[in-house]
Amino acid sequence: MKKSLIAAAVVAALPAFAQAQTNVTMYGIVDASVNVIDLGDNSRNALIIGHGTQSTSRWGVRGSEDLGGGLKAVFQLEAGIANDTGAHDAQFFQRTAQVGLQGGFGTIKIGRGYTPAFRMHGTWDALSYGLFNNLLTATVPIAAGGADTAVTRFSNGIYYDSPSFGGITVNAAYASGETTDEALERSAGEGWDISIGYKGGPLHIGGYYEQTKDAVANETERFGIGGGYDFGAFRLVAGYSEREEDGFDKYSAASIGGVMKLGTGSIHAQVIRLGNDNLPDADATAFALAYVHPLSKRTNLYAHFGTTRNDDNGTFGMRTGAESFLADAPGSDVKGFGVGIRHVF
């Protein structure tokens, strides 16, 4: 009830706030789909009304204040919406909650936001973190059927984005574990990562390294490298990412994909080889095919198909922008197809 009242108060205040501060913008995405999902031989096919399928449904406010001398104050607050039920995230501004400074030195922000690793990983995704078997299939946690090759967000974080130096950019982040218990290591709960990218003409390449520690300071390392080339009517992307944890063998994801223009729309295709070295015959191959058709600059329709074919002991699933679909048993294949609409405001 408290969260509902807070949300209502924030929304009610936005028009007056935006009028008083013309550099404040309210924005959002509403994305809905109708899908048929098959989780394997031990489950029946199901009709799923999806939310956030191409892009996670959300609303937010962002803005800036000119402080003079080329310096700006910037902020962003963003909340997720499950528009199939009307529910919102348990943490109200779970997606982004940041404030910082921007200038010739780059941008420094404090709060909760996307990690440089996650942002870099998405640059070699042919489906831009949306639709069946986008690269979230690789980055989501193992319990959600993924390979956990990049942490999506840090809380309690400090973020730095550099300006471009001849097409080269550097992004870094540190998250405090805020550990005060003397019985625990100081580094418990911490995380940090760095990404370096280059973009020049039709070529973009980049990589990242990430290290996180759990509540008892067990360490997990992640890295990735990839890029793409835009030929005009066709864009090719490819990459490799890996996760390794203390006491466990690695998980990995190798992908190749492409985007081809077709009239006013575009065809997207991608193949991901998902690896699990902890068990024999536990890998999987994920495939995606989609068509996106714009109706305007802000509204588009889409149709998509995806399948994840697990080896005998594989438990990998399939992911859209906001939802994970898990195999019903080791070795089961997951597949689905559907259509949807996305509106950006």
Model feature map: region roles:
Residues 1-20:
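Gram-negative bacterial Sec-dependent N-terminal signal peptides
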Residues 4, 45-57, 92-95, 152-156, ...:
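Residues that define the transmembrane beta-barrel architecture of outer-membrane proteins
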Residues 24-32, 69, 73-77, 108, ...:
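Transmembrane beta-strands of outer-membrane beta-barrel proteins
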Residues 187, 191-294, 304-307:
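Detector for outer-membrane/organellar transmembrane beta-barrel domains
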